[in-house]
């Protein structure tokens, strides 16, 4: 009997050691973050093991594991929910049950997942869209798009743009009872990247007459030029989104060729002839002083021109919205940006805030202290719940 108890004790110690990860002092409910990280870490290990054995691609396995979050379209007494397609792109629509004679606000939402997994039917996305539709009395469109590694850039951008452009057709807006003067776009992480890129593209499309009233970018990924930002240095090994995982997301967005990932990890993937673009992502001039924290800017080492020729997407503004010239930013709508303290993507958002402000765009920046990447998806945490409410309240006041 004593041996059995001793065995359980050893097992408990090992399990606690596997779950425990040191976290900063200002992180609320650290055990919730540790348990979440344990699930993500275990999924990652299993996916990597399967890839090493040649059973499945890492991202395909991660997408498979994440499907446990899938939630069918379920209407309730307040919101009608249904799945349909906009010009063959799958979307989930949320429409308030209450009848109204006036037109409603419209929000077009793009999910995250590193362009490799994620879906509008994940429980956290479904719940956030449902809350948004109910509290704003708005029509919410939550779109899907084809994913890497099966599909690479610009497929994801094109899918989202196709769905949004269909929605913005005046006849389609009328059929859903949406006010053409009160439409916003929103996205988180990779979805924030797509939202920013799509908002820029709309300004150049003569076929689209409807103007967005707001854009909300939730811890967006906005550039693949420099992976040596202070946020990448400080948060490289924190839970949810490590530097190595984010770099893999970026490389898979363009190709399954591992040589690109290797070059990105060493920050040697941008050719000399494109060095003029670094001014758009130079954190030494774009980050607020309090986020520099004594970090020294290192001029990136230039990479092979062959990589850029094989994968021109790495230089495309549709993939990296921070590469847009100031003149292209000036027409963008009122913008709300969320960044998180412990997130490798923090500085992408901070730099975009600075560039938008310098271009005359009105920007509201909500920096969430003590939060990790993906916090709005973690509505079971206090910080995630607060951030979601702040996001919805801002939309209520400005959309």
UniProtKB/Swiss-Prot annotation:
GO-annotated molecular function: serine hydrolase activity; triacylglycerol lipase activity
Xref: InterPro entries: AB_hydrolase_3 (IPR013094), AB_hydrolase_fold (IPR029058), Arylacetamide_deacetylase (IPR017157), GDXG_lipolytic_enzyme (IPR050300), Lipase_GDXG_put_SER_AS (IPR033140)
Signal peptide: none
Transmembrane segments: 5-25
Coiled-coil regions, chain positions: none
UniProt catalytic activity: a triacylglycerol + H2O = a diacylglycerol + a fatty acid + H(+)
Membrane topology: Single-pass type II membrane protein
Gene Ontology biological process: lipid metabolic process; positive regulation of triglyceride catabolic process
Cysteine-cysteine disulfides: 116-340
Membrane topology, Lumenal segments: 26-399
Gene3D superfamilies linked: alpha/beta hydrolase
UniProt keyword Protein biosynthesis, yes or no: no
EC number: 3.1.1.3
GO terms under cellular component: endoplasmic reticulum membrane
Major location category of this protein: endoplasmic reticulum
Function summary: Displays cellular triglyceride lipase activity in liver, increases the levels of intracellular fatty acids derived from the hydrolysis of newly formed triglyceride stores and plays a role in very low-density lipoprotein assembly. Displays serine esterase activity in liver. Deacetylates a variety of arylacetamide substrates, including xenobiotic compounds and procarcinogens, converting them to the primary arylamide compounds and increasing their toxicity.
PANTHER family reported in the protein's UniProt record: AB HYDROLASE SUPERFAMILY PROTEIN C4A8.06C (PTHR48081), ALPHA_BETA HYDROLASE FOLD-3 DOMAIN-CONTAINING PROTEIN (PTHR48081:SF28)
Family: Belongs to the 'GDXG' lipolytic enzyme family.
Name of this protein: Arylacetamide deacetylase
Origin organism lineage: Eukaryota, Metazoa, Chordata, Craniata, Vertebrata
Gene of this entry: AADAC
């Amino acid at each position: 009997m004593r041996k059995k108890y001793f065995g359980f004790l050893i097992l408990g110690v090992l399990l606690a050691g596997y779950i425990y990860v040191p976290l900063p002092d200002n992180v609320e409910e650290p055990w919730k973050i540790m348990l979440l990280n344990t699930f993500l870490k275990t999924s990652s290990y299993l996916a990597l093991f399967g890839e090493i054995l040649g059973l499945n691609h890492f991202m395909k396995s991660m997408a498979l594991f994440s499907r446990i979050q899938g939630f069918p379209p379920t209407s309730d007494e307040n919101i009608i929910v249904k799945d349909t397609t906009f010009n063959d792109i799958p979307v989930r629509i949320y429409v308030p049950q209450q009848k109204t004679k006036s037109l409603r606000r419209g929000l077009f939402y793009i999910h995250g997942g590193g362009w490799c997994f994620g879906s509008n039917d994940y429980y956290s996305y479904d719940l956030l869209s449902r809350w948004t539709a109910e509290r704003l009395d708005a029509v919410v469109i939550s779109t899907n798009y084809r994913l890497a590694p099966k599909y690479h850039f610009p497929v994801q951008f094109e899918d989202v743009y196709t769905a949004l452009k269909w929605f913005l057709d005046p006849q389609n807006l009328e059929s859903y009872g949406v006010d053409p003067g009160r439409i916003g776009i929103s996205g988180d992480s990779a979805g924030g990247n797509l939202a920013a890129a799509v908002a820029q593209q709309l300004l150049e499309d003569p076929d689209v007459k409807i103007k967005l009233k707001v854009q909300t970018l939730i811890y967006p990924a906005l550039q693949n030029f420099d992976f040596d930002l202070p946020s990448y240095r400080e948060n490289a090994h924190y839970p949810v989104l490590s530097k190595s995982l984010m770099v893999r997301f970026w490389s898979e967005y363009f190709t399954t060729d591992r040589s690109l990932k290797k070059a990105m990890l060493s920050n040697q993937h941008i050719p000399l002839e494109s060095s003029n673009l670094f001014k758009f992502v130079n954190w030494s001039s774009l980050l607020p002083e309090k986020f520099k924290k004594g970090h020294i800017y290192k001029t990136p080492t230039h990479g092979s021109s062959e990589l850029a020729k094989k994968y021109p997407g790495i230089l495309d503004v549709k993939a990296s919205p921070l590469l847009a010239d100031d003149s292209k930013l000036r027409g963008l709508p009122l913008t709300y940006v969320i960044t998180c303290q412990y997130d490798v993507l923090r500085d992408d958002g901070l730099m975009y805030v600075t560039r938008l402000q310098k271009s005359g765009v009105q920007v509201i920046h909500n920096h969430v202290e003590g939060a990790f990447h993906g916090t709005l998806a973690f509505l079971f945490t206090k910080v995630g719940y607060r951030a979601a409410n702040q996001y919805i309240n801002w939309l209520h006041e400005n959309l």
